[in-house]
Structures are given as C-alpha cells and as structure tokens.
Amino acid sequence: TQMVKSIVEHENITVELCRSFTQKMRTDYDHVFFSGALDAFYSCQYGRLEYRTLDFKKILCQRDYQGCAVMNYCSIDIPYTRITEHKYFSPWEQHEASICYQEYSRECEADDIPYYPVRRADKMDLLNKYLSRAKKEKNITFIGRLGTYRYLDMDITIAEALQTADVYLTSLYEQKEMPAFTVTV
C-alpha cells in the first residue's frame, strides 16, 4: 500500500531483513520499538509463551478462484482457516490468472515464526513475569501483537502504532520518559 511504501522509503528508516534483534543492539539507538515476541526478547528466560503459527499452501488458478480478496473458513471440517486471493487487493489491474494462498494454523514450535499469541488463564503467571520485567525497562517500548502478547486485528495494530508515535513525540517534547507499553497489557 502507499502507506507502507512511504514508511519504508523514508530517509530516516532503514529496512533490514533476516536480522534478529540482540540486546547489544539497544545501545545503538536512543529508543527501541520492539514488535517481536515478548518472551524472545528475554531469550525465553522464564519459559516459552504459547503462540499459533501459519503454514501457507499456494494455489495457482487460470481463472477467478473465490471472487473476493479474503474468505475465512470457520468449520472444523475444513483444515485451513483462510484463503487469500491477491488480485482482488488491486481491482484496477487486470489478471487472467490468480494466485491464492490457503492458511493453515497450528501450534507454534520453537523454530517456527509466531503469528498469534495464545492467552490462556493457566499461563498468565508466565506472561506476568515477562510483563513485570518489561515494564521496568528503559528506552524500549513493546508494540504490536507479539510485543504486547495480545491478539490484534490489523486496524487496531495500525491505530495503536499511530498512538504510540504520538506518545513518543509528546515524551520527546515534554522531556519525559517513554513507557515500556503505551497500551494496557
């Protein structure tokens, strides 16, 4: 989208791919906004929090596949949770063929990419250890789904990112300390 393009092309932003954050990197910046997994930030010192991950299956089709960009599947009889047909994200373009992806959700293992936090009552003690430690941090703010360990839809994620930017700019202007979380966790 134009919003993402303007962010990644901004002169003050450098995008680095396939590079994991390390604690040593914190000294390179005045303030860090961390959107990775909260437990991973602390090298899972207290244990791993629970996440769901996704596997994707690509479908190539020489026609229209489902007639819309995203179709969610909530039936226990269907093994995937969603199909995304990307050509519908840009309806002004004409495409003969279509590329779709089926999304399969499963429990996240140690080497998987976490997508969705799984907050469970029986795991709150573990989460609270990480939250308590994070709230004591200086010069870092935990953001997004993984950083705040909450399920968030994208519209809420973007709204919270904008709110966090406002809080940060206000803290700079008023010379106040930026909190570790700008939302209730």
Outline where the language-model segments fall.
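Mid-domain catalytic core of redox enzymes
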Residues: 19, 23-129, 133
